[in-house]
Amino acid sequence: MYSFLFTKMHGLGNSYIYVDLFRETLPEEDLPAIARSVADVHTGIGSDGLILICPSEQAPVKMRIFNSDGSEGKNCGNGLRCVAKYAYEHGIVRDRSFLIETLSGLVEAEVTVENGEVTSVTIDMGEPRLRRSAIPMTGPEAEQVVAESFAIDGREYEITAVSMGNPHVIFYVDDIEKAPVTTLGPVVEKDARFPEGVNVEFVEVVSERELHFRVWERGSGVTQACGTGACAAVVASVLNGKTARGVETVVHLAGGDLTITWGHDGKVRMTGPAETVCTGVYYYRGGQNG
């Protein structure tokens, strides 16, 4: 058994346990099991996974993310906002605009501060990756996947696929409250046409500036919010002519709202809140709670 300090934070209800590796040390081989342990609502803390705030050779800070099933992810928009808040409020960075390293590359964060507290964060998520090979999805490597027919479980759907450093597939629905998140989501997540799995998004278009959104996250299942997924939904909606490029779009997630723009410079920018829930000491007992 050993213990470590943690902070629980959330972005629109998408909650993770954050461990500051500027101050703590965790064995690399234990990280998947620790993620499963802290995520458990009965024997752990309860969260969508584990995020490590790490030193970096490329930026002031690095983010590593482990899903609730122990798998390591490449990117997390809500996690990035929380990492930015933590890094600024704990003195890891002093500038209000700074880089964060992720497994999918460097991203720029800009914090809005009131009375020393970060109240919102804007993340430059970079350019979406649209080639089929970059998502990745099987089929002609150079093609985009826009309004493509997709057969599964004996039914035909229309999908658009986007990578924001992690894979997303978007289904449009007429009523977000009736979206088959828990039935279609897990089936599509593990479909062989997505060799690395995929995050599954359901989107209802309200107007050119407003979307309703629900998500089945790869490795975590239903979550309250997914920042990269909301970005992918806006990109997909522009590609399908449902929203406009360079216009702020409000995305209503189960946990709250994000404002997202796919700019004419090619970059996707996301603005939203980040909240600290609690801090404490976690006692990790290996197999007993991992």
Curated annotation (Swiss-Prot):
Signal peptide: none annotated. PROSITE patterns: DAP_EPIMERASE (PS01326). The active site is at C76, C226. Keywords: Amino-acid biosynthesis, Cytoplasm, Isomerase, Lysine biosynthesis. GO terms for cellular component: cytosol. InterPro entries: DAP_epimerase_AS, DAP_epimerase_DapF. Its EC number is 5.1.1.7. Coiled coil: none annotated. It holds the Pfam family DAP_epimerase. It catalyses: (2S,6S)-2,6-diaminopimelate = meso-2,6-diaminopimelate. GO terms for biological process: lysine biosynthetic process via diaminopimelate. NCBIfam families: DapF (TIGR00652). Belongs to the diaminopimelate epimerase family. Homodimer. This is Diaminopimelate epimerase.
